[in-house]
Amino acid sequence: AIDYENGVLGGVSSVLQAFTAPGEAILLHSPAYIGFIGTITNMGQKIVYSPLKKDEQGVWRMDYEDMDKKLKENHIHLAIFCTPHNPCGRVWEREEIEKAMEVYEKNKCLVISDEIWSDLTLEGHKHIPTQSVNEYAHEHTFAFYAPSKTFNLAGLVGSYHIVYNSYLRD
């Protein structure tokens, strides 16, 4: 279930090309990594943003009601999820990822999970792989990883994906 990709954005492009049509909407949290914005628009899809909200302590949180509303209103069946989040740096807790995946499942939405920053978390924070939180996440998520952030190897462009569902993988 692990295979090579020509960079995370190359992998994202491959998934967009295989599972969406030009003009389809893709759900993306904002603020968003500029690479996602360019890749989605260059592939001909449109972006529907679900803004992250700061709570009373200044911690970025997902707005699950907004996600659900946007998925339904725009008939979205593919979302990009960034964990840890880029550019906010937020390391999502298991319960937050579980709740996001419940929203995606309710809307029959596939998920691209960019986990390229998974090795770089501050003390007291632990990266939870998206595919580990429930069965839906395990079977409906394209998870992307790369050594480029951890080991400063961006020039090598290599990355890999983990896809457990053989239909999605093939």
Regions found by a protein language model. Give the residues of each.
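Walker B catalytic acidic pair
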Residues: 115
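A short helix->loop->beta-strand "cap" motif at the edges of active sites that frequently abuts
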Residues: 24, 45, 104-110, 138-139
